[in-house]
Amino acid sequence: MKKLAFIGVLTLLMSFNGIAQQINWVTFEEALELQKKKPKKIMMDVYTNWCGPCKMLDKNTFQNPDVAKYVNANYYAVKFNGEGNDVVKYKGNTYTNKGYKPEMASRRNSVHDLTYAFQVNAYPTIMFFDEKGDIITPVRGYQNPQQLELYLKMFLNDSHKEIKTQEEFNAFYTAFKPEFKG
């Protein structure tokens, strides 16, 4: 009986250990409000419901325990549907998707005004913002955990401010040693 109880407890502990850490996603407006209390940079995943690489980014990169832990500790993470129907307030403007069609929610839909304002023209795009909510830069396309790690660390430490040329970025990229497991 004691053996059975021990096996049950051991199984329970192992199942808790196997639960992957998740990114704590918030809305863009929530992230901007949180910045007022505790300044952090923002990482925004601009995705669509129909985008295959967006789904790969979710599954392979954002569910990676190293990515989730690092993002949660250092960034406010935002998921924004680039073709969704959310009403978003940013920098004194209100952004909507006037052409949104609910029946097209899982297919290509009208592009959200905020997506246009950020000049996002490819999905997925990961937008990075500084502690004041100003855009640092977009990073277009699928990123595996190690590729995203480079940008997460570069922007967190403001290393990007020292990089002025493509050659300097190439040197930074070459010297970077990823630590995230893939």
List where the protein language model places each region.
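Short active-site neighborhood of thiol/selenol oxidoreductases, capturing the structured segment around
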Residues: 38-52, 77
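Solvent-exposed coil/turn segments that connect beta secondary-structure elements
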Residues: 49, 82-83, 132, 144
